[in-house]
C-alpha cells in the first residue's frame, strides 16, 4: 500500500501530517492508510494550481475537452475497478456503485453541452462594432467532496471546472480517500498538465487549511449543511470569491389519492432507503392520510420494509441496502431514533444496528404524528423514515415546508390537479410527481433553497458557477463617429 497519496504539481507525495486510514464498513478491515497533508503541502498544492492557471486557461476549449474525454475513456476502461473501490469504502452494493461510475461518464457529455450552451460565445451586432459575451475561469478553485457519492459528486464539480479553464485543489471526504486517489490517477493517465488538478488528503484540519487559503478564487462544496454554513460564514466579506454549496435536506414526501398501493410503496422505499438513506435527497418525512387508504399504504410499507435485504456489497445475490459509511454513522442513527422516541414518537419498524462493529443497519419507520410540532429539524442521514398522518392536504404541505432546508419534495397522487396545487406551494429545488424524490436528471439543475445550498451544483447548471461572464464591445480599428455629441469639435 503506497504512502504517496497527495498529488501536487504532477507528482505523488507522502503526507507530512498525522496517520489516517480508510475502513471498509462492511468487511470491517483497513483498506487504505497514509499520512494527512500538512498545511505546507496545502500551500504547495494551491501554489501549483496558481502556476498552471495561465497556460491552462489559454488552452482552447477543444484542447481542454480532449483531456476530459480521455478521462472518460479511462473511466470506461476501469469502471469495474472503480465501482468496487466505491463499494469497499462506502458499503454500497455493486449494483449501485456501477451506476455511480456510469453517471461519472455521463457527466462529460452533459458538461460539454452545458459549456457551449450556457457559457459559450454569444455575438450581437451593434450599429458600430460588435458586442460579445464570453466567459473566463475564476482561476484556482477548491473542490470538497462528500462520502456518499465519492466519485460522482466531486466529478460534477471537477469536470465543468476544468472545461471552463480553472485549476483545482481537490479535498475528498476523509472517509473515502481511496476513491479519490484512484480517480486522480485516471486524470493523471489522461495527461493533464501538472498543477491543473491537485489532490490533498486529510481530516478537518486539512479542510480548514484549504478553505481558508487566501489564494483561492473559489470553493465548490458538496456535504453537510453544518460544514457548508461554516464555509459560508468564513467567506462572508469576500465578494470576489465564488462559493457554490450543495448541502443537506429534510425532505417531505406526501401521498394522497393513489390507486396502486404497491407502486406507491415502491416509490416510498426508493425515496427513503436507497443508499441506506444516505442521499441528501432522501425522503425523511412521509405524510399519509389519516384514513383507510393511508392505513393500507402504511401496513404494506411496514411489511415490505421488514423484508428489505441488507448485506455485503459483493454478495452474489445483491442486497437493496449495503452498509452505512461507518459504524459511527450507524450508531448515530440508533441514537437519532431513540431521541425521537423520547420525544413521544412511536416505533413502527425498529432501526437496528445489526453488527456494532460494522455499518450495517436495518431500515426503520417511526410515527411522529403526536410530536410533529416538537420534532427537531435535523437531517437524520440514514434509513429512518418519519411518518406523519394528516387530515388536511394544505396542512401536510405546511408541515413539509416547516424546515430550514429546501432540497427535494414529492407527491404521490393520481390527481394532476393535486400536484399543481402542491407544486405551487411546496418550497424545494427539486419537486417530483409520482417518482422517487431521490431521482434527478443530470441535465437538470440540482440543488435547493434555504440551508440546502446555493447555485445548482453537479449538473448541467454547474457551468454557471465555473466561469464568469465578460461583456465586450469591439471594433477592428479606432474610428471617429460620424455624429459627434454636442459640444465636441474635431
UniProtKB/Swiss-Prot annotation:
Q: What class of enzyme is it?
A: oxidoreductase
EC assignment? 1.2.1.71
Q: In which pathway does it act?
A: Amino-acid degradation; L-arginine degradation via AST pathway; L-glutamate and succinate from L-arginine: step 4/5
Biological process (GO) annotations? arginine catabolic process to glutamate; arginine catabolic process to succinate
**Would you say which domain of life the source belongs to?**
Bacteria
User: InterPro entries of this UniProt entry?
Assistant: Ald_DH/histidinol_DH, Ald_DH_C, Ald_DH_CS_CYS, Ald_DH_CS_GLU, Ald_DH_N, Aldehyde_DH_dom, SuccinylGlu_semiald_DH_AstD
Any one GO MF annotation of this record: succinylglutamate-semialdehyde dehydrogenase activity
Q: Which reaction does it catalyse?
A: N-succinyl-L-glutamate 5-semialdehyde + NAD(+) + H2O = N-succinyl-L-glutamate + NADH + 2 H(+)
Q: Which residues bind NAD(+)?
A: 223-228
Q: Name one Pfam family in it.
A: Aldedh
Keyword annotations for this protein, in alphabetical order, are: Arginine metabolism, NAD, Oxidoreductase
Q: Which PROSITE patterns match?
A: ALDEHYDE_DEHYDR_CYS, ALDEHYDE_DEHYDR_GLU
Query: Catalytic residues?
Result: 246, 280
Gene3D superfamilies hit by this protein? Aldehyde Dehydrogenase, Chain A, domain 1, Aldehyde Dehydrogenase, Chain A, domain 2
* Family under the similarity heading: Belongs to the aldehyde dehydrogenase family. AstD subfamily.
Stated role:
Catalyzes the NAD-dependent reduction of succinylglutamate semialdehyde into succinylglutamate.
Protein's name in the database: N-succinylglutamate 5-semialdehyde dehydrogenase
Specify the species. Answer: Pseudoalteromonas atlantica (strain T6c / ATCC BAA-1087)
Source lineage: Bacteria, Pseudomonadati, Pseudomonadota, Gammaproteobacteria, Alteromonadales
Gene giving rise to this polypeptide = astD
Amino acid at each position: 500500500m503506497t504512502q504517496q497519496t497527495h498529488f501536487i504539481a504532477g507528482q505523488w507525495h507522502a503526507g507530512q501530517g498525522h496517520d489516517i486510514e480508510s475502513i471498509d464498513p462492511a468487511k470491517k478491515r483497513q483498506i487504505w492508510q497514509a499520512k494527512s497533508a500538512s498545511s505546507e503541502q496545502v500551500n504547495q498544492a494551491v501554489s501549483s494550481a496558481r502556476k498552471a492557471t495561465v497556460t491552462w486557461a489559454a488552452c482552447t476549449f477543444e484542447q481542454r475537452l480532449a483531456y476530459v474525454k480521455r478521462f472518460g475513456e479511462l473511466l470506461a476502461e476501469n469502471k469495474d475497478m472503480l465501482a468496487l473501490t466505491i463499494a469497499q469504502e462506502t458499503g454500497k452494493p455493486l449494483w449501485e456503485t456501477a451506476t455511480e461510475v456510469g453517471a461519472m461518464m455521463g457527466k462529460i457529455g452533459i458538461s460539454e453541452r452545458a459549456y457551449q450552451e450556457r457559457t459559450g460565445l454569444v455575438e450581437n451586432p451593434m450599429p458600430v462594432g460588435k458586442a460579445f459575451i464570453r466567459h473566463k475561469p475564476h482561476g484556482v478553485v477548491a473542490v470538497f467532496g462528500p462520502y456518499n457519492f465519492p466519485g460522482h459528486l466531486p466529478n460534477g464539480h471537477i469536470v465543468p471546472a476544468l472545461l471552463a479553464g480553472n485549476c483545482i485543489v481537490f479535498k475528498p471526504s476523509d472517509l473515502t480517500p481511496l476513491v479519490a486517489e484512484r480517480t486522480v490517477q485516471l486524470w493523471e493517465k489522461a495527461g493533464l498538465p501538472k498543477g491543473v488538478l491537485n489532490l490533498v488528503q486529510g481530516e478537518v484540519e486539512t479542510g480548514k487549511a484549504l478553505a481558508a487559503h487566501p489564494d483561492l478564487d473559489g470553493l465548490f462544496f458538496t456535504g453537510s449543511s453544518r460544514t457548508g454554513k461554516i464555509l459560508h460564514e468564513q467567506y462572508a466579506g469576500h465578494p470576489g470569491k465564488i462559493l457554490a454549496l450543495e448541502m443537506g435536506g429534510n425532505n417531505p414526501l406526501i401521498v394522497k389519492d393513489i390507486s396502486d398501493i404497491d407502486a406507491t410503496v415502491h416509490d416510498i422505499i426508493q425515496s427513503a432507503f436507497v443508499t441506506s438513506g444516505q442521499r441528501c435527497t432522501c425522503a425523511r418525512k412521509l405524510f399519509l392520510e389519516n384514513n383507510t387508504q393511508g392505513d393500507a399504504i402504511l401496513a404494506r410499507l411496514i411489511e415490505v420494509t421488514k423484508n428489505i435485504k441488507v448485506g455485503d456489497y459483493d454478495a452474489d445475490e445483491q442486497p437493496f441496502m449495503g452498509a452505512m459509511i461507518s459504524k459511527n454513522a450507524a450508531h448515530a442513527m440508533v441514537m437519532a431514533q431513540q431521541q425521537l422516541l423520547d420525544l413521544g414518537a412511536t416505533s413502527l419498524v425498529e432501526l437496528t444496528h445489526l453488527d456494532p462493529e460494522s455499518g450495517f443497519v436495518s431500515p426503520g419507520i417511526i410515527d411522529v404524528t403526536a410530536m410533529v410540532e416538537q420534532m427537531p429539524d435535523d437531517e437524520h442521514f440514514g434509513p429512518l423514515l418519519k411518518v406523519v398522518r394528516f387530515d388536511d392536504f394544505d396542512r401536510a404541505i405546511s408541515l413539509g415546508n416547516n424546515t430550514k432546508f429546501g432540497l427535494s419534495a414529492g407527491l404521490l397522487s393520481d390527481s394532476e390537479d393535486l400536484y399543481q396545487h402542491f407544486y405551487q406551494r411546496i418550497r424545494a429545488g427539486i419537486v417530483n410527481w409520482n417518482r422517487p424524490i431521490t431521482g434527478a436528471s443530470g441535465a437538470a439543475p440540482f440543488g435547493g433553497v434555504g440551508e440546502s445550498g446555493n447555485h445548482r451544483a453537479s449538473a448541467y447548471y454547474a457551468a454557471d458557477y465555473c466561469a464568469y461572464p465578460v461583456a465586450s464591445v469591439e471594433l477592428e480599428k479606432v474610428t471617429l463617429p460620424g455624429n459627434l455629441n454636442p459640444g465636441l469639435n474635431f
